[in-house]
Swiss-Prot record:
GO terms for biological process: cysteinyl-tRNA aminoacylation. It catalyses: tRNA(Cys) + L-cysteine + ATP = L-cysteinyl-tRNA(Cys) + AMP + diphosphate. SMART domains: DALR_2. This is Cysteine--tRNA ligase. It comes from Prochlorococcus marinus (strain MIT 9303). The gene is cysS. SUPFAM superfamilies: Anticodon-binding domain of a subclass of class I aminoacyl-tRNA synthetases, Nucleotidylyl transferase. Its cofactor is Zn(2+). Monomer. It is found in: Cytoplasm. Binds 1 zinc ion per subunit. The lineage of its organism: Bacteria, Bacillati, Cyanobacteriota, Cyanophyceae, Synechococcales.
Amino acid sequence: MSLRLTNTLTRRTEPFTPLKDGHVSIYCCGVTVYDLCHLGHARSYIAWDVLRRYLLWRGYSVTFVQNFTDIDDKILKRAAEKKCSMEHISEQNIEAFHQDMDALGILRPDRMPRATQCLDGIRALIGELETSGAAYSVDGDVYFAVMKHHGYGKLSGRDLNEQQQNADGRVADAEEARKQHSFDFALWKGAKTGEPSFPSPWGAGRPGWHIECSAMVREELGETIDIHLGGADLIFPHHENEIAQSEAATGKQLARYWLHNGMVNVGGQKMSKSLGNFTTIRALLESGVSPMTLRLFILQAHYRKPLDFTADAINAAATGWKGLNAALGLGNIYAEALNWPECKPLPQEVMQPAHSSTLEQCSEIRQHFIDALDDDLNSSGAIAVLFDLARPLRALANRLERGDTKAIQETAQLNLLPRWQLLVELANVLGLEAEKAAKLAPEGNNRVDENHIQLAIAARKEAKAARDFAKADRIRDELRAQGIELIDKPGGLTDWISS
């Protein structure tokens, strides 16, 4: 079986065939850099990191492009709040983004264009759309004429007649009268007093949100790409509008495969900054959740399905990772005692013509792993393979950690080295790597005073009820400094996790 992916555009799971044999072009919608990334971002970028790693492991060359939106209403609002420049907010959060992604072991994209660095391409694309009649200008603003694009709605499945006005939430009510149709969206926004602006044939202004990605895809990867990635919340309007703009300009298909990840939910609601129910990646890691625990938590659910963020789920992932980490670290820690001279991943070609029962088993295990990821990136199935592979390794590691030297002789006949090498190799495809053994904390230092936490949660709830949000934030920060991360849920309930 070859790799099969669920294509949002066709609503089918299809065999993946790249445009160019052996090479895959991928564009992933990046973040708007006005704040720190939350767990929803981690879910998206870990999922696509696994896609990229898997393609590379299977022998493809991959060009992976991911953008930064560094000019947007949210950035301008944050800059005004902080009394600093838009550039300062963008640079600060781009650096934070890199730090968070690096901490999670996410491979950096090959190229990361910024909207403000692609203005020539953006202006050129808007000009082409206006010349063809697909766009029109009104007093310094330029809009895309949705009704003139007959394929509009093919990605989201929406009918224009059923859509609400201002579906993208980015056009103010006062501007409605300027547009030919309420569904038309801005390609270029005329300059406003006090806001940064850039020159254009239509006057000073700045690009709309959707046109940025269309221009960057064309500039970095060409008119048609293999795979376009993003969260399910981007299907409409962002990706629908991308398709409309790009295909109206080029007459060619923008992307052959559209993949979308499901949302992270807290108490049945999507995690988002607008709802205030989000947890940043940084806060979660600072609370003591390890990067690999977070990866495992995210990958235990299929990328297209909703993912419920709960303390129990994080703690279960931490327990699972503890065992997997012990197995992965076996060859690093006990190589000399086990007389394993070559502690490197087993070459794939060795696995094919198996000459022993161990290698035959490894070959079968490898194929089970491939079958799982070929099935629309079934990461939970791939992780199940890792746990089965790790079981005897974890048992040996536990015995050695207890000082049981008999374990070496008793397991010698099992020939576990190829099994460990395969585990390291396959885990790396999922971005899971052994962590260094943590130093033991002094007696009593790692105990959690649950009564103290509950009292603090109650005090914070009272502060919020009294609208003393500064005090509520201070209590949260104090608990965070103690390694406790709070998780607010609907109905005024608060859960917590600890390191």
